[in-house]
């Protein structure tokens, strides 16, 4: 490979000796060999290429032919070259960046300087190739065309001299093409390496943080997609302007030589316009910077919308989110329009400036009555057209440089923001696993605080984000002794105060406390996620962590449990059994190879939590940090997991168990009670009970809650539970959870359950794959875009403006030829001696003013058409992208939940980030250049055909080769683009998943390299075609030059000059036109991918609705009736609710119980019509809910979800997004949910910021805010889906009482695992396998010893 070898991490070998020049540049030097017949068979053919193969992209020919013959996939492409891999390049870039930081410090470190060092040798080689190319490009149009035209004027001229000049012209053009291709060959690999190096480095830096406090997922997606591509384009285009000074000096000198001082007028036009372009680029950069900030916000909001879509639908908040996103999009569009106007002006400058320079130069020359001949005039035109290159490349280069500058600044912020040094130390005693001595910790670290403006410090101090942990442990309800923010000094706000305890090897430490008391923060402190202010935190041994909200990534169950570990059959089976997953896995369609949706969407909360626990158990670590892992499972499963997993399997391991289920603390070796971030009590369970302090009171409260109702209600269950033998009890308890017909196989379960899976497992069971066929550009794609841009008339008008602008430039040159011909005839006359007169001289007395005014007017018209074109084109393209954005968003918004279960969020985010960036910025840029170049090619061919009709025969013969090449190229490049598009979505999914699970993983595999090498092939394919096109055009140039030479006086010299000046442009212009056309079509792939959603997304409400079927005050009572109701999540999947016939009276409170996966949450989805019934229906107050609009239905119901959801915004926005309630009402509900004191402590009160995922509040506090949100809705029917699972018993009781009081007279459905939350219900509904097996009053069911409810109750009593 020509250029520097960024294959080596340093100049030293493994022994520390400096590598020789030959060793360092060995791969590059081998590529300099013209032909390498005996090259080694490298995995990637580019590594075996010699100079000719490398420069002409011949190494790619087999791939192009294969793409023509068959469909390309990731597997059929050659593997990535090791020299282009992300690993190799990122390591080298890391070394250079570290050196820069060490030299000048992180703040002064220049990322652009490191980028230059990373690729400077390659860039210099590229510039050398470009200079050679530009010299050849200048010699042909200036020297040779002038000589050829002069030769045609000499009647005594020798033919062989003319032919020799034509051959020389062909040779210079061919050499130009070769060096141009070589420059791009170097460029593409340079750009690829820079892109992968920085993308990988940024990603590695992000995952090195244990928690992200400074960047959102939306910003990460934007940086790793749009910003990394900006760097790719910068590496391609930024070296090109280095050739401009050489080109300008060469052309200026020759123009002065043949034209005289007036040539300086044209040169000065170019010189003046270059700083104008620089200014416009700066302006464009400023608008782009502002737009990127708004784009980040839109992508972040979209990510939040897609992540929380279930709750948004259940609350009917679609309008609120639609308004938010549309408002952001409107702001983004305004900024993009401003950037688009500037960019469009820059793109139009190239043809405009060359026309202005030509017209002004020749007009002034004539006004000064200087001699002007056709050879001189058209040599000057040809020369100025070559100089047009300097203006033509500047928009690309300046745009790329400006965007790269913005991108580098954003990336630098990430690279210099180092993860704070670990405060974790090793305890001196090897038997001590955990040691905290007077440890005080905070979530904010000193560096970030110092860099924060003073006026924001107070707010930032309280709004620091965290990952899956509880912040603000001081804000527990009731908040005794907590100091408000206004009472804080400049010192950092501590969250954990003076924590001291020791845990020995093999012990179980139980941690309890109220919501927000600091339990999760304590685990975060042990993980090193917080900031130590004073004291010591010592940890010994390897860690496993189970977060409070389970993190599940897209894959199958087994992959989630193994998490990259080797599969050990015995260990795996044991882990599955002790985590109570055997039954769940046997019920899944493909066992443990069943595909899981993103974030575990197709699993219940309990299943997600136990898979997360199984991951920890299988990892076989020394220390286990378990954050409330049993809150989401029923009593029987909870007891099994605690006994079999925590007490037995983890025996000998050290376990720190945070729990709200206090009954498990009795089995812990030591218990810590936290309050306000401090250890309130500490000791064994027995010691703490004897002290009769807060802990003892909590335990007594728990027992009181269980037995405060009439004792006979539970005595029967207790007697039944204890009169049987242990074995019988286990068997009976097990019967509850076995599916019908499975009892006889129960004894075999440990054996047969070991596989959990059929031998044939479909590759994609749940998540629909993005087929390579998706994104194929058809006429429908263009039709969709044209309709979105305002229709066919507006589109035709826009294209017509391009025609007028380019036509004005062509007309000016044609008019000049006409003028020169007229002057020639007037001067020489029919009788004149042609050898004695000034051929083509334009005299002052032949009506020059008419010709001159028309000639000048053509320039003015071109300016007018150019400005109008830029305005209309920018408006039209942004209208199209905004219309498509809104249409796709609306379609996705109205899609059913099954769509979101089967479509990865990463794929949807790809559409709204990368694809929208393509539509907003890159498609207009490439389309505008393509249309300009296309009409230039058309006018050139028309003029050539008019001057030399015979050239059409040559064009026809060359067209055959052109179409063969085009067919191979088009098929091949389309296949490559599809592979690139399809491979991009998993990368987005991977980024999103990694950012969400950052508290659990600190490093994850990278897929960037695989996407990047598809990009390399795609771009190399463009150059493969371009080179071969240029060779064909050179043959055409040679033919036209011969015709000019051999035609002598049969055609006027001005016509010959006009045809030669144009044909010399066609050589490079046609291939650029085809390339930009292909790029434009490739960008239209994004339109097609969006069109797929527009055409295929089916709205969730497919039933015809009757207008006015919803009574005004409905529902007035809240009676719910299920009639023969059946439901399945998707077609061809098993029923999850089967033949439900159920009547719930108005005002009743119904507790819904059953083991994990029994259908409890599905009942809620049916009620909200998140899934339409397979058969049967549901009546509420005798109204069939299936004939109501979804908005009417869902606004009348309220849900408090299992996983608390808060949105980015303010506290007020989260409670009341439509602002339909007063502040007083909001404070009232906060008071009733014990959150008033917490919110009052925040500087902005109700307007206080809520960060991404609500992570500046603890999980319990988030749930309390969700309860407050529900209280505001004032519904007659309330669904509590495990609503208090994340709360301690005391807060749970308070909230339950609040709910009971606030929703008096309402129908309340409570889904719960902890039976104490349903004991006071009017009725209990027991679910199993999607069926109702019991529905009665709790006392009635408890008195039946064989009832399923009694057995569940007995299992909990035994705990």
Curated annotation (Swiss-Prot):
It comes from the Eukaryota. SMART domains: AAA. Expressed in testis (at protein level). Widely expressed at low level. Isoform 5 is specifically expressed in brain, testis and breast cancer cells. Probable transporter, its substrate specificity is unknown. GO terms for cellular component: endoplasmic reticulum; endoplasmic reticulum membrane; membrane. ATP 2 binds at residues 1154-1161. GO terms for molecular function: ABC-type transporter activity; ATP binding; ATP hydrolysis activity; ATPase-coupled transmembrane transporter activity. It holds the Pfam family ABC_tran. Residues 451-466 have a biased composition (Basic residues). Residues 123-403, 795-1082 form the ABC transmembrane type-1 domain. Belongs to the ABC transporter superfamily. ABCC family. Conjugate transporter (TC 3.A.1.208) subfamily. Residues 467-701, 1120-1354 form the ABC transporter domain. Residues 446-491 are annotated as: Disordered. It is a multi-pass membrane protein. Glycans are attached at residues 405, 438, 540, 981. One of its GO terms (biological process) is transmembrane transport. ATP 1 binds at residues 513-520. The chain crosses the membrane at residues 125-145, 159-179, 231-251, 256-276, 348-368, 376-396, 791-811, 853-873, 934-954, 1031-1051. Keywords: ATP-binding, Endoplasmic reticulum, Glycoprotein, Membrane, Nucleotide-binding, Repeat, Transmembrane, Transmembrane helix, Transport. This is ATP-binding cassette sub-family C member 12. The gene is ABCC12. It is found in: Endoplasmic reticulum membrane.
């Amino acid at each position: 490979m020509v250029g520097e070898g960024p294959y080596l991490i340093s100049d030293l070998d493994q022994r520390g000796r400096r590598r020789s020049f030959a060793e360092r540049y060995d791969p590059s030097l081998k590529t300099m060999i013209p032909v390498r017949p005996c090259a080694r068979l490298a995995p990637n053919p580019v590594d075996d290429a010699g100079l000719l193969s490398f420069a002409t992209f011949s190494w790619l020919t087999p791939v192009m032919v294969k793409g023509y013959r068959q469909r390309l996939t990731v597997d059929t492409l050659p593997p990535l070259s090791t020299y282009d891999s992300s690993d190799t390049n990122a390591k080298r870039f890391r070394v250079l960046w570290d050196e820069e930081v060490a030299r000048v410090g992180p703040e002064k470190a220049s990322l652009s300087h490191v980028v230059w060092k990373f690729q400077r040798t390659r860039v210099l080689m590229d510039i050398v190739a470009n200079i050679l190319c530009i010299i050849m490009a200048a010699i042909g149009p200036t020297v040779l065309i002038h000589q050829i035209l002069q030769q045609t004027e000499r009647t005594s001229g020798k033919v062989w001299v003319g032919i020799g000049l034509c051959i020389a012209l062909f040779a210079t053009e061919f050499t130009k093409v070769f060096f141009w291709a070589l420059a791009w060959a170097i460029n593409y690999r340079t750009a690829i390496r820079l892109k992968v190096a920085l993308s990988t480095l940024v990603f590695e830096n992000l995952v090195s943080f244990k928690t992200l406090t400074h960047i959102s997922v939306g910003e990460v997606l934007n940086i790793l997609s749009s910003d990394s591509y900006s760097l790719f384009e910068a590496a391609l285009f930024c070296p090109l302007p280095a050739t401009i000074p050489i080109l300008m000096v060469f052309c200026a000198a020759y123009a002065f030589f043949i034209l005289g001082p007036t040539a300086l007028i044209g040169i000065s036009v170019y010189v003046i316009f270059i700083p104008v372009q620089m200014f416009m680029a700066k302006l464009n950069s400023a608008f782009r910077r502002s737009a990127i900030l708004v784009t980040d916000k839109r992508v972040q909001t979209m990510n939040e919308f897609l992540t929380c879509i279930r709750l948004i639908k259940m609350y009917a908040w679609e309008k609120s989110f639609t308004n938010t996103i549309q408002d952001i999009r409107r702001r983004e569009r305004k900024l993009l329009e401003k950037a688009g106007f500037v960019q469009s002006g820059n793109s139009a400058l190239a043809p405009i400036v060359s026309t202005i320079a030509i017209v002004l130069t020749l007009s002034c020359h004539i006004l000064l009555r200087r001699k002007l001949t056709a050879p001189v005039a058209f040599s000057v035109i040809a020369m100025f057209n070559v100089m047009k290159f300097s203006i033509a490349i500047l928009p690309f280069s300046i745009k790329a440089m400006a965007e790269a500058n913005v991108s580098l600044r954003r990336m630098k912020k990430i690279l210099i923001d180092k993860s704070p040094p670990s405060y974790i130390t090793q305890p001196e005693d090897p038997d001590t696993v955990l040691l905290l001595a007077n440890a005080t910790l905070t979530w904010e670290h000193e560096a970030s605080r110092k860099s924060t403006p003073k006026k924001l410090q107070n707010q930032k101090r309280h709004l620091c984000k965290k990952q899956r942990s509880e912040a603000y442990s001081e804000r527990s309800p009731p908040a005794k002794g907590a100091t408000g923010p206004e009472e804080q000094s400049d010192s950092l706000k501590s969250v954990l105060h003076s924590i001291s305890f020791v845990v020995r090897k093999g012990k179980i430490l139980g941690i309890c406390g109220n919501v927000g008391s600091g339990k999760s923060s304590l685990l975060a402190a042990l993980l090193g996620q917080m900031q130590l202010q004073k004291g010591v935190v010592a940890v010994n041994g390897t860690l496993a962590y189970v977060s409070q909200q389970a993190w599940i990534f897209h894959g199958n169950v087994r992959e989630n449990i193994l998490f990259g570990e080797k599969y050990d059959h015995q260990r795996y089976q044991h882990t599955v059994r002790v985590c109570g997953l055997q039954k769940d896995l046997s019920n899944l369609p493909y066992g443990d190879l069943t595909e899981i949706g993103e974030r575990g969407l197709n699993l219940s909360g309990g299943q997600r939590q136990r898979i997360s626990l199984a991951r920890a158990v299988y990892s076989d670590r020394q220390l286990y940090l378990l954050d409330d892992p049993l809150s989401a499972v029923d009593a029987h499963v909870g007891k099994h997991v605690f006994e079999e997993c925590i007490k037995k399997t983890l025996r000998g391991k050290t376990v720190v168990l945070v729990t709200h289920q206090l009954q498990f603390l009795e089995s812990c070796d030591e218990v810590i009670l936290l309050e306000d971030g401090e250890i309130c009590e500490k000791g064994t369970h027995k010691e703490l009970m004897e002290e009769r302090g807060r802990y003892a009171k909590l335990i007594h409260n728990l027992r009181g809650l269980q037995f405060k109702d009439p004792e006979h209600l539970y005595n029967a269950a207790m007697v039944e539970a204890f009169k049987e033998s242990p074995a019988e009890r286990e068997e009976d308890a097990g019967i509850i959870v076995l599916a019908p017909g499975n009892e006889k196989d129960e004894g075999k379960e440990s054996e047969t359950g070991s596989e959990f899976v059929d031998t044939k497992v479909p590759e994609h069971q749940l998540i629909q794959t993005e087929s390579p066929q998706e994104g194929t550009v058809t006429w429908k794609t263009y039709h969709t875009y044209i309709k979105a841009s305002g229709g066919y008339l507006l589109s035709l008008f826009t294209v017509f403006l391009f025609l007028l602008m380019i036509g004005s430039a062509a007309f000016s040159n044609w008019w000049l030829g006409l003028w020169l011909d007229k002057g020639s005839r007037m001067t020489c006359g029919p009788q004149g001696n042609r050898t004695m007169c000034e051929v083509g001289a334009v005299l002052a007395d032949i009506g020059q003013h008419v010709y001159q005014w028309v000639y000048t007017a053509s320039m003015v018209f071109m300016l007018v058409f150019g400005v109008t074109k830029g305005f209309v084109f920018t408006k039209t393209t942004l209208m199209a992208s905004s219309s498509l954005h809104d249409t796709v968003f609306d379609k996705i918004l109205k899609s059913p939940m099954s769509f979101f279960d089967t479509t990865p969020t990463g794929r949807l985010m790809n559409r709204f980030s990368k694809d929208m960036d393509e539509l907003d910025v890159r498609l207009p840029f490439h389309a505008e250049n393509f249309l300009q170049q296309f009409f230039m090619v058309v006018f050139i061919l028309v003029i050539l055909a008019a001057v030399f009709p015979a050239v059409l025969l040559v064009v026809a013969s060359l067209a055959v080769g052109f179409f063969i090449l085009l067919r191979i190229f088009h098929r091949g490049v389309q296949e490559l683009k599809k592979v690139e598009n399809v491979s991009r979505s998993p990368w987005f999914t991977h980024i999103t998943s990694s950012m969400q699970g950052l508290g659990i993983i600190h490093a994850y595999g990278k897929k960037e390299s695989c996407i990047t090498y598809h990009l390399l092939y795609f771009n190399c394919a463009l150059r493969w075609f371009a080179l071969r096109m240029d060779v064909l055009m050179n043959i055409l140039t040679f033919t036209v030059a011969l015709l000019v030479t051999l035609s002598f006086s049969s055609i006027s010299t001005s016509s010959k000059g006009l045809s030669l000046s144009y044909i010399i442009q066609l050589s490079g212009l046609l291939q650029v036109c085809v390339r930009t056309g292909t790029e434009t079509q490739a960008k239209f792939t994004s339109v097609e991918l969006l069109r797929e959603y527009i055409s295929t997304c089916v709205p969730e409400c497919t039933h015809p609705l009757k207008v006015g079927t919803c009574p005004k005050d409905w529902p007035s009572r809240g009676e719910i009736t299920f009639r023969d109701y059946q439901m399945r999540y998707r077609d061809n999947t098993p029923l999850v609710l089967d033949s439900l016939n159920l009547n719930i009276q108005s005002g009743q409170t119904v507790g819904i119980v059953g083991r994990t996966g029994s259908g409890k949450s599905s009942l809620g989805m049916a009620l909200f019509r998140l899934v339409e019934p397979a058969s049967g229906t549901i009546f509420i107050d005798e109204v069939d809910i299936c004939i109501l609009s979804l908005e009417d239905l869902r606004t009348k119901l309220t849900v408090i979800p299992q996983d608390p959801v808060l949105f980015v915004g303010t506290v007020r926005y989260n409670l009341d997004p439509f602002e339909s309630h007063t502040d007083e009402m909001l404070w009232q509900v906060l008071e009733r949910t014990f959150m008033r004191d917490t919110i009052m402590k925040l500087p902005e009160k109700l307007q206080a910021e809520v960060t991404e995922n609500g992570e500046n509040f603890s999980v319990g506090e988030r749930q309390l805010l969700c309860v407050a949100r529900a209280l505001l809705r004032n519904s007659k029917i309330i669904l509590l889906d495990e609503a208090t699972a994340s709360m301690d018993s005391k807060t749970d009781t308070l909230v339950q009482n609040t709910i009971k009081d606030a929703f008096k007279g309402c129908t309340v459905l409570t889904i719960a695992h902890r039976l104490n939350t349903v004991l006071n219900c009017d009725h209990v509904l027991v679910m199993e396998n999607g069926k109702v097996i019991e529905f009665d009053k709790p006392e009635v069911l408890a008195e039946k010893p064989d009832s399923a409810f009694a057995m569940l109750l007995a299992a909990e009593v035994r705990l």
